[in-house]
Amino acid sequence: MSKEFTVYSKPACAQCDMAKNFLKSKGITYKEIELDVGQPKVLGKTYEDVSAFKAANPDAKSAPQIFVDGKRIGGFNELRQMLQ
């Protein structure tokens, strides 16, 4: 059974792009949820879902935030460590 990866990203975020490119280079598909500082531009999620994410993960202040099978692993560096 393959793992489900979710990447919470922000526009013009170099670390977010690095994480997504890293996943692609490993042949891993992922779901992206893009959070904008102003009005949330969310792919496949509602504003309430994004608000719930922020409330449940108050220490997740940087982007990207990466989840594997629903569990937050952290950002790009943690993703790279996990997959190497």
Which role fits each region the language model picked out?
Residues 1-33:
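Local sequence-structure signature of Cys/Sec-based thiol-disulfide redox active-site neighborhoods
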Residues 28, 58, 81-84:
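A generic structural signal for secondary-structure junctions
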Residues 67-84:
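Non-catalytic, surface beta->alpha helical segment in thiol-disulfide oxidoreductase systems
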